[in-house]
Amino acid sequence: MKMNKSLIVLCLSAGLLASAPGISLADVNYVPQNTSDAPAIPSAALQQLTWTPVDQSKTQTTQLATGGQQLNVPGISGPVAAYSVPANIGELTLTLTSEVNKQTSVFAPNVLILDQNMTPSAFFPSSYFTYQEPGVMSADRLEGVMRLTPALGQQKLYVLVFTTEKDLQQTTQLLDPAKAYAKGVGNSIPDIPDPVARHTTDGLLKLKVKTNSSSSVLVGPLFGSSAPAPVTVGNTAAPAVAAPAPAPVKKSEPMLNDTESYFNTAIKNAVAKGDVDKALKLLDEAERLGSTSARSTFISSVKGKG
């Protein structure tokens, strides 16, 4: 398959460019539609994949160990995830999340965008998907937002997610959940080490699709930005799309010993000071993060046995 580009121009809204903080030279030179660094994938191999339809109605979840597919192409390691996205609903915003597993490993995603003729149109390397700290309703993750503008006549776009041998040699520095929680509630940051996640061929991916109802003023051509830039892709004939695979359900995982100890101590201290509301909030957060002892610690503390 030739790696010729079908996208028309890379554009940025004036407001988006002005609001992008601290753009470095490397960020400015990043051009999503430059697919020369992406693996060369034969058309026949792409046609053999099952492309899971994703729309705005729900977030598509894929556990690569069970829902991934094999694509035996040089430059790609382990299973891949393949999605199809409607291209006739306006400008698209795709948010891809790769969740950290047990504070020890994470899948470093690369994304190749193809038009409806399976022609490579944009490439987002693993460096585009940056580490996001855990929050009240979110886990540690690698995440990136891609803005795509399908050309007129496009019916579908294709999103191929994979990792590489180079990515597997690298790691991601995480933030311990106890530190993240302490920062969020204004407590002192505990002096505990941050975990490091190795990159693996397995992981939990989440893809969310949105459309922008209001059009923005676009200027171009530009080189790019650290902020997501809309990429125009396009051609006309649409290939057939296979049925989606079912999405597995993620199980909650136990937290690390240091994190467990931090929350248990914080719960005991809150109860000792008579601040039961704070203790309950700590309990809820600890159990959300996978604690198996926070509830018993809370109960024993309230009973005066903590």
Curated annotation (Swiss-Prot):
GO terms for biological process: carbohydrate transport. The keyword Mitochondrion does not apply. Its main location: periplasm. Keywords: Periplasm, Signal, Sugar transport, Transport. The keyword Cytoplasm does not apply. It is found in: Periplasm. This is Maltose operon periplasmic protein. The gene is malM.
